[in-house]
């Protein structure tokens, strides 16, 4: 016998004894459970229905103990069952399903979907006016627990919803009462209801009651069930609501302490403050000043936030001042222009200079270098020159600094310095101060801010702590001041609701979601279909989630286009769509990628434009509508003659329609209501072959026409993109801000660009072109950008010394160059 043979035989002998002892328990206990598990799994993948993820996850959870045990001891079990092919096959099947069940189910579902597409081909060809394309059919047939249909502009979003609804009724025999269709407006819900009913009657000869609702009407129905009566809606008009808020303001400001809080906010915190060093260019700072309408109470355009604060302090304390009045001594030289101190107090013959320096005397680089000097050195030279003038002419100078504002002592220090010079500091009465802010239209704007905040505060179910936690540190003091004036408004508002046994729109959703979570209302929906899903808000999300959590078998089918998410200002959160699985778990996603609206040139330009934002879901849309000529034209015109240029373009479109012997539809799209053309009747009369509608970009969503003109695509506060910014107090309650510049405005411009089937014209300005135009047509711009602020352009101007080139951002940017190019 060879060495080791006896030892090996003995080991084998004991192993056989061990496995013989285990074998009965495997056969009697584990194999029975495995057979049951495999039989269940086979039912999922050999049936006549789509197999969804939740079924598999529940199966896997049920058999987790067996799966874990077999995973650890698979080799031993195979050894034990040697020679028993049936049991080994069972063990193998279970192990395969447990470890790789997703792949097995995916293969089954692909086969199932292919079979359904074939079996339902007649249905898909006839249920809508035009046959559903393959992607639309696949979206209908997939029956996952959570389904996200990403529908590009013109790709048949509504067609897909109609197809899904009809498929559930006709093919899956779903009870219509268990299908809930949610839309964001009553008009959309009604249109969907009518369209589905008509198709069901015409094609399937079925009279079906369509359960299409808005989120609010669904919520109201739930509250009615819980209360056993239909609650009244408070303030049935916007006018009544605003009247109520004005009355609350007048009532609250009778109280001295509240009035002091209110005035404190108006005087110290009305506009959000950002220090100069927070900006990377002068142009950025100018845009911030303009976007937040940071002007003095005397309606002056000053160069900085800090100067406005100083001006308002002087004004509110009855100290007469002149802004940038030329110094009373002539100082003009080859090196410097005539000196103009920031403020002059004529009654006291005192000058005030506000220096934009930090504690180290430094300034941001964008303040501008001069010849061979860095920005800080150049600014310091300017400071020394100005101070030397006051010393030379023995004039009184008070100096303030940017770092004092950042430290919260700017006005306190200014007040002490003024007192040292004997300046009488006497604040206007509360009534006078409030009247000045009323006259400046600031109080109505603040009440509007409070109302907007109230709606978002309620709809998101925030607390004061939530609001402060969402705020950056440098805005917490301002936010705390705002909350002091907001809470009494909120308490009066809620008190009014209770006294009148009423609810508001926020209650319809928030309270309904609460009652669903508490099972005070139990639904029986098998399917929830949501249209325009990109517009969902966090409050509506919580409502939907409550419905799904209450009934795990309920399936969700959402259709939307993140490229067309344009309602963040009302609380919508596009990230709920772009991060769908984070909010709803595993989902089947499909992109409807064939547009039936516009041609390939409009498709390419618009798709490239919107996808510059990397956060948008990537889509490769396609179309069968191919054209040779470029259907997009950008026309540069002066804004004062834009309407005459608009008329010319419309007449040209009219001629094109006339040559075709047709009447064509046309949109004139503007960013704002006030910017709609005044001469629309004149245009329509001059263009009998056109049916013209003037609409805003927001209103144009979902609509289409043969031609479209997008007007006034310029830069500025009321430009496109909009130069106004939301108050941080409001944005703190909205979804997380997007990192990409003008993200929502970019999507809005995409919506405007994708309304035309055949041709689109964009009207812009060479003097104030929109940044979108700079991007779309950089070669078409003839004016040079300002090298100082970077956001303005240089245009020809006339002065006492003749023509020169100046920046369009004047008076904030005072860069000039003579016509020969000498600065």
Features from the language model and the residues they span:
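C-terminal accessory regions
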Residues: 714-782
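Conserved RecA-like helicase ATPase core segment
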Residues: 382, 387-388, 541-629
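Helicase P-loop NTPase motor core
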Residues: 149, 158-161, 279-281, 291, ...
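Coupling/switch/interface segments within P-loop NTPase motor domains and analogous charged loops
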Residues: 52-90, 234-296, 346, 400-496
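A short beta-strand element within the Helicase C-terminal
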Residues: 693-726
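Conserved P-loop NTPase-based nucleic-acid remodeling module centered on helicase motor cores
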Residues: 16-49, 53-62, 178, 183-266, ...
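Active-site beta-strand-loop-beta-strand hairpin of nuclease catalytic cores
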Residues: 339-361, 393
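Conserved helicase NTPase motor core
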Residues: 25, 32, 53-54, 60-73, ...
């Amino acid at each position: 016998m060879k060495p080791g043979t006896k030892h090996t035989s003995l080991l084998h002998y004991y192993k056989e004894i061990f496995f013989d002892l285990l074998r009965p328990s495997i056969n009697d206990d584990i194999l029975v459970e495995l057979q049951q598990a495999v039989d269940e799994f086979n039912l999922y993948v050999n049936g006549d229905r789509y197999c969804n993820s939740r079924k598999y996850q529940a199966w896997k959870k049920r058999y987790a103990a067996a799966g874990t045990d077999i995973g650890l001891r698979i080799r031993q079990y195979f050894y034990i069952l040697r020679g028993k092919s049936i049991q080994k096959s069972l063990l193998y099947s279970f192990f395969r399903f447990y470890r790789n069940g997703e792949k097995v189910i995916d293969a089954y579902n692909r086969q199932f979907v292919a079979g359904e597409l074939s079996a339902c081909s007649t249905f898909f060809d006839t249920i809508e006016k035009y046959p559903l394309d393959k992607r639309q059919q696949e979206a209908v047939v997939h029956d996952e627990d959570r389904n996200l249909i990403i529908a590009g502009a013109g790709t048949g979003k509504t067609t897909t919803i109609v197809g899904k609804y009809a498929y559930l009724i006709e093919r899956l025999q779903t009870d219509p009462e268990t299908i809930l269709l949610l839309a964001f407006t009553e008009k959309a819900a009604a249109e969907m209801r009518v369209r589905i009913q008509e198709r069901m009657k015409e094609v399937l000869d079925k009279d079906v009651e369509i359960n299409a609702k808005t989120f609010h009407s669904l919520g109201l129905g739930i509250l009615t069930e819980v209360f056993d009566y239909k609650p009244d809606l408070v303030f049935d008009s916007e006018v009544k609501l605003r009247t109520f808020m004005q009355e609350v303001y007048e009532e609250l400001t009778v109280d001295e302490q509240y009035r002091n809080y209110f005035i404190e906010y108006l005087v110290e915190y009305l506009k959000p403050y950002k220090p100069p060093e927070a900006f990377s260019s002068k142009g950025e700072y100018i845009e911030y000043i303009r976007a937040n309408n940071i002007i003095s109470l005397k309606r002056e355009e000053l160069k900085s936030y800090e100067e406005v604060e100083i001006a308002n302090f002087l004004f509110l304390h009855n100290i007469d001042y002149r802004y940038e009045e030329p110094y009373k001594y002539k100082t003009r030289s080859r090196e410097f222009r005539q000196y103009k101190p920031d403020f002059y107090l004529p009654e006291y013959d005192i000058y005030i200079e506000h220096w934009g320096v930090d504690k180290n005397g430094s300034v941001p680089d964008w303040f501008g270098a001069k010849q061979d000097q860095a920005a800080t050195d150049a600014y310091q030279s300017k400071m020394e020159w100005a101070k030397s003038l006051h010393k030379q002419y023995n004039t009184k100078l008070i100096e303030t600094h940017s770092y004092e504002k950042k430290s919260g002592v700017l006005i306190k220090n200014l007040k002490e310095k003024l007192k040292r010079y004997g300046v009488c500091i006497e604040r206007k009465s509360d009534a006078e101060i409030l009247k000045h802010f009323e006259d400046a239209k600031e109080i109505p704007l603040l009440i509007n801010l409070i109302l907007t905040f109230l709606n978002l505060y309620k709809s998101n179910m925030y607390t004061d702590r939530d609001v402060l936690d969402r705020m950056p540190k440098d805005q917490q003091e301002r936010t705390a001041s705002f909350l002091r004036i907001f809470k009494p408004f909120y308490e009066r508002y809620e008190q009014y609701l209770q006294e009148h046994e009423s609810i508001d729109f926020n209650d319809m959703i928030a309270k309904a979601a609460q009652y669903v979570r508490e099972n005070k209302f139990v639904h029986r929906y098998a399917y929830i279909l949501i249209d325009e899903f990109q517009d969902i808000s966090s409050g509506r999300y919580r409502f939907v989630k409550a419905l799904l959590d209450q009934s795990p078998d309920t399936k969700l089918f959402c259709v939307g286009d993140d490229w067309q998410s344009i309602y963040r200002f009302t609380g919508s959160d596009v990230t709920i769509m772009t991060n769908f699985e984070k909010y709803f778990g595993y989902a089947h996603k499909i992109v409807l990628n064939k547009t039936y609206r516009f041609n390939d040139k409009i498709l390419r330009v618009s798709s490239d434009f919107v996808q510059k934002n990397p956060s948008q879901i990537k889509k490769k849309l396609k179309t069968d509508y191919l054209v040779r000529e470029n259907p997009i034209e950008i026309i540069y015109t002066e804004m004062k003659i834009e309407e005459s240029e608009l008329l010319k373009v419309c007449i040209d479109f009219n001629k094109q329609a006339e040559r075709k012997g047709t009447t064509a539809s046309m949109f004139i799209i503007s960013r704002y209501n006030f910017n709609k053309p005044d001469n629309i009747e004149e245009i329509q009369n001059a263009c009998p072959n056109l049916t013209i509608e003037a609409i805003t970009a927001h209103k144009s969503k979902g609509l289409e026409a043969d031609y479209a003109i997008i007007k006034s695509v310029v830069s500025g506060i009321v430009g496109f993109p909009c130069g106004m910014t939301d108050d941080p107090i409001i944005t703190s309650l909205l979804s997380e801000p997007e990192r990409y510049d003008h993200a929502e405005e970019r999507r809005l411009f995409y919506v405007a660009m994708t309304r035309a089937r055949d041709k689109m014209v964009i009207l812009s300005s060479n003097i104030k072109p929109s940044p979108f135009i700079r991007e779309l047509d950089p070669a078409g711009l003839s004016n040079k950008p300002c090298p100082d602020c970077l956001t303005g352009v240089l245009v020809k101007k006339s002065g006492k010394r003749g023509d020169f080139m100046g920046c369009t951002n004047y008076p904030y940017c005072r860069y000039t160059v003579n016509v020969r190019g000498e600065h």
